[in-house]
Amino acid sequence: MAGHSKWANIKHKKAAADAKRGKIWTRLIKEIQVAARLGGGDVSSNPRLRLAVDKAADANMPKDNVKRAIDRGVGGADGANYEEIRYEGYGIGGAAIIVDTLTDNRTRTVAEVRHAFSKFGGNMGTDGSVAFMFDHVGQFLFAPGTSEDALMEAALEAGADDVSTNEDGSIEVLCDWQEFSKVKDALEAAGFKAELAEVTMKPQNEVEFTGDDAVKMQKLLDALENLDDVQEVYTNAVIVEE
């Protein structure tokens, strides 16, 4: 992938996540509650809950916290009032942005999301205005130096759709989002532990930002990420560090 390093971006993302661990735990607890409410408390039969619990483990969340969140979701308390709402919009230069939220007050949430967009040079769009520019997929990223041939064989056998090597040597594996847990288990059983493993909205095309534009775009993305009701922010913008 020309012009920027996938691997550097992932390391930056992980470092930023570590710095916001408390916020990540709060988001994961909400996601676990909602997943348990909608699909039951058994991770073996609830893929969404399984994904959330795996993320909680990766974030070093205590198992007691996870169990309490599942119990609250199944019992209908607290998490029962959360509503899933997706907002779509544009950053500077027309960059596409998707904002997924879990909220108990949609009036508050839409006001906060709209304010973040307008404050940092973006604007909210209508439903479907940018979502078509993304694919809902399972994504795995493996460190440079991973055996490409062995990983490709294991990934394709596990049911992955695509395996590609980036210019920085990292290897990306993509699969249908509904097959994510199955592919993840198979890859780990074959000895491959991904540095990044997630269900995501992957942009079909990316737009690079440098200099002042990169700073402005990062401020918008940070403002959206920092909103309490926001669970995930997806964009086709790539911030190039110079």
Curated annotation (Swiss-Prot):
GO biological process: regulation of DNA-templated transcription
UniProt keyword list: Cytoplasm, DNA-binding, Transcription, Transcription regulation
Oxidoreductase keyword on record: no
GO cellular component terms attached to this protein's record: cytosol
Main location: cytoplasm
Similarity field: Belongs to the TACO1 family.
Protein name: Probable transcriptional regulatory protein Bmul_0984/BMULJ_02280
Organism: Burkholderia multivorans (strain ATCC 17616 / 249)
